[in-house]
Amino acid sequence: MNKKSSRLYCFSPTVMLITFIFESFSAAFAIFKYKSSKIRTLIILLLISLASFQIAEFMVCGAWGFSGMDWARFGYLAITLLPPLGLNLAYEISGKKAGVLVKTSYLTCVAFAVYFVFVSGSVFAGDNTCRANYSVFNTPNGAATFLYTLYYYGWLFVALFFCWNQISKISKEINHGILRLILSRSKRLNMIINGENLRKILALKWLIGGYVAFIMPTTIVNIVNPSTIEGIPSIMCGFAVLMAITLIGFVAPRTLELKNK
């Protein structure tokens, strides 16, 4: 952290670039390894959004003919997509139709995306944001920062609650199945307990783990130093790779079908 500033900054450009490469490779891996499905599409979009944010952080000092402000807007656009995509993924894993909550999350996402892309002064990225080992961009408007924080944490916690609720429901179904197995003295466990439900539980648990790894460190930083709320995206960038690892390493194998099957 800069002693002369209340902002917490991202890791070095080298770390940003390595993370971008990993997340991009993970998205490509999912495309070529798994059969097309809604879950695969959502996982790929999440990974692409994470990678896009990393490259925006890496380029925020200006590159490829675009200004730092352009890259900052692009970065905010990318990270704003994460909450609705994550909630939608949780619904798909659970086998539930995307309802009012998911649609509302996308509508609020579009509202913030339009704000960050088209409203002047919605994002700050100037010469003072560029350092030898880090870069940062943030929202200078206090009211917008509060609303964006509410949007971000609100939908993330909605997704967490939904995952937990679905795990509880599916677990009850499995427990009832085991009870029926005992009472009937049947040895056909696979006919009573749906293996698909077990995979759903594991996938949802890993998704919760990814959310916690993504949210908890940022939340702790915000609690310790509330002024860092304005730089939430720059703080999250250091932990985004944990979510990417969870998606490609643990959620995808339990929810997607291999192409060579």
For the regions a protein language model found, what residue spans apply to each?
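Membrane-embedded alpha-helical segments in integral membrane proteins
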Residues: 1-2, 24-30, 53-62, 216-222
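Interfacial "cap-and-anchor" motif at the non-cytosolic start of specific transmembrane alpha-helices
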Residues: 9, 13, 180, 187, ...
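Alpha-helical transmembrane segments in multipass membrane proteins, preferentially the mid-helix core
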Residues: 25-29, 85-92, 152-177, 181, ...
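Hydrophobic alpha-helical transmembrane segments
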Residues: 29-33, 91-92, 114-118, 218-226
